[in-house]
Amino acid sequence: MYVVNPEEKVIEIMKQTGIDLAATLPCDRIKNLLPLVSENFPEIKLTREENGVGICAGIYLAGGKPMMLIQSTGLGNMINALESLNVTCKIPLPILASWRGVYKEGIEAQVPLGAHLPSILEGAGLTYTIIGETEKLPLLENVILDAFENSRPHIALVSPKVWEASECCAWQAAGMPIKPEIMERTCRFSLTSGTLKPFMLRNDAICTLASELDDEITVTNLGVPCKELYACRDRELNFYMFGSMGLVSSIGLGLALRSEKTVITFDGDGSLLMNPNALLEIAKEAPKNLIIIALDNGAYGSTGSQETCALRYIDLEIFANACGIQNTAKVNSKEGVIEAFRKFKAMRELSFIHVILKPGNTNAPNIPMSPEEATKRFKETLDVKKF
C-alpha cells in the first residue's frame, strides 16, 4: 500500500485550504518539500524573509491566499513586520517554519534562537503551533484555517523529526541548478560628475502625482509621507503604511502580481535602503503594472531628517538599474515628475522614478483612521471593484 510522505501531505493540506501562492526560502530539513511546492503552486523565491511578509500582504489584499515556507531563523527578522503590519492591520499569514536548533541539531549557532522561539513568539503575542512528529502534521490545516479565519499570522514550528522517516526524493530528482551558458542582461544608466539640484519638497512631488491619479492603486510609506498623501488626496485605493518600514514596494509587488490595475508605490530613500532586497524581488518578478516612486530627500524625514546614505553615497536609480529594472528616470521638478509618470504609465512596464527632493516636512495632520480601518476600507474597495 502506498504511504503518503509528509512532504506530499503538506502539499495536500495547502491545496485543500486554498493556498494559491507560496513564498519560500530554503532550509536543509525541507529540501524535499520545496521542489514539490515549486511544482504545485505559483512561487516567489525570496532573498529575505521579512520581504516575504510584505509581498504576501499585497497578495492577500488583492484577493490571494499566500503562505510562507521558511527556516525558523528567518522569524528573527520578521517579528516587527508581523507585529506592525499583520497584527496591526489584521492581515492573515500562515507560515511553515522549519524549526531548527531543537532536534538533532548539528549546527551550534542554530540552538540559541531555536530553543527560545516558543518563548519569543509568546512574548510577541504571535500565535504558533508546534508540529513535533509526522502524526501531528494534520495540525497544519488548523494553522492555515486559523490564520485566515482570524486575520492574523499563525506559525507552524515543524520539527525535523517530521521528515525523518520520509522516503520522498524530490530534491534528488530536481537536481542541481544549472547556470545558462549565455545570459543577456540589459542595464542602462549614466554617470555624471554632478547631481540634480533639488527644488521640491516631498509633499510637492506627492501632491503633483496625486493630481494625476485615476483608478491606480497606491501604497505609501509610513509616517509623514502617508499623512501628506492623505491631506493632498485621500482615496479608497490608497493603502497607507503605519509601520513596517522598508516594505512599501514589497506590498506593491504583491498587489501588482494579483491585480491588473497599475500599482504605484510612494517609497523613500531611507525605506529602500532599509530593505534593498525589495528591488531584487521586484526586478526578478518584473510586474508590468508596477511604478516605484523613489522620493529621495537624502533624509529620514519622519524621525528628524537625519542624513541617509542616499544623500552622498548611493544613487538609487543606478541601484535600481543594477537590480535589473530597465525603465528608470531621474527628475527634480513637477514637470519632470508628470512627464516620467505619464510616459511609464503608458508604456505599462515595470518602472522606477527617482525624484530628487529637498528635506523637509509639512504639518499634515494624522490620518483619522486606525490601521485596521484603513486596511479594511482598502481591501473592501479592491474586492468590490475586482481589481
Swiss-Prot record:
GO terms for biological process: coenzyme M biosynthetic process. Coiled coil: none annotated. The keyword Heme does not apply. Keywords: Coenzyme M biosynthesis, Decarboxylase, Lyase, Thiamine pyrophosphate. Its EC number is 4.1.1.79. Its cofactor is thiamine diphosphate. It holds the Pfam family TPP_enzyme_C. GO terms for molecular function: sulfopyruvate decarboxylase activity; thiamine pyrophosphate binding. Pathway: Cofactor biosynthesis; coenzyme M biosynthesis. It catalyses: 3-sulfopyruvate + H(+) = sulfoacetaldehyde + CO2. It comes from the Archaea. Binds 1 thiamine pyrophosphate per subunit. Involved in the biosynthesis of the coenzyme M (2-mercaptoethanesulfonic acid). Catalyzes the decarboxylation of sulfopyruvate to sulfoacetaldehyde. Is not able to decarboxylate the analogous compounds 2-oxoglutarate or 2-oxosuberate. Belongs to the TPP enzyme family. This is Sulfopyruvate decarboxylase. It comes from Methanosarcina acetivorans (strain ATCC 35395 / DSM 2834 / JCM 12185 / C2A).
